[in-house]
Amino acid sequence: FSIMGDWAKGEFTAAGKKPGVDYYCAATPSNNGYLYNVDSFIFYKTNDPDKQAGQKLLAKLMMGKNFQKVFNLYKGSIPARLDVPMDEFDSCAKTSNSDIKTAGAKGGLVPSFAHGMAQGNTMKAALQDVITEHFNSDMSSKDAANALADSVLQNM
């Protein structure tokens, strides 16, 4: 049993594995929200008109419906755009796409803690220290919760 992100699905697909047969997809840790992580591309500031035009073209192409479809079919994830038709996607992607739309409408989108989308590195390190201590010692859950709250306050 393993919990993986949708990035693993691209590898499963490349290996000829089928969702619902060789592996299963489910929201984790629950179906009340949607934990997300997004890949980002950063364009450095430039005064060169040719470079600016290239940056704009790359951004336009990457966010195009066709690129989003093809890229995500191979990667195993879902498009960043919500208006990309999902008819060629498998059941896992269709469910994930539906889940993100539902969570977004209900305010249930949760940024990834592990990938720095929810907080900066200082806060993440402080919280991980408490979590590590809790799981590797006799620290009670109540004490861990209090220590987490203290860490947040100290690192805001």
Residue map of PLM features:
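Extracytoplasmic/periplasmic substrate-binding proteins
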Residues: 1-51
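A residue-level marker of the well-folded mature domains of exported/periplasmic proteins
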Residues: 6, 14, 18, 44-50, ...
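Alpha-helical elements of the RecA-like P-loop NTPase motor core of helicases
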Residues: 10, 69, 125
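Structured segments of extracytoplasmic/periplasmic soluble domains
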Residues: 15, 61-65, 74, 130-138, ...
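N-terminal alpha-helical segment
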Residues: 36-37, 54, 123-127
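Short amphipathic alpha-helical coupling segments at ligand-binding clamshell hinges
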Residues: 49-62, 144
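Periplasmic-binding protein-like
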Residues: 59-85
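C-terminal capping/gating helix-and-loop segments adjacent to ligand/active sites or protein-protein/ligand interfaces
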Residues: 80, 84, 98-152
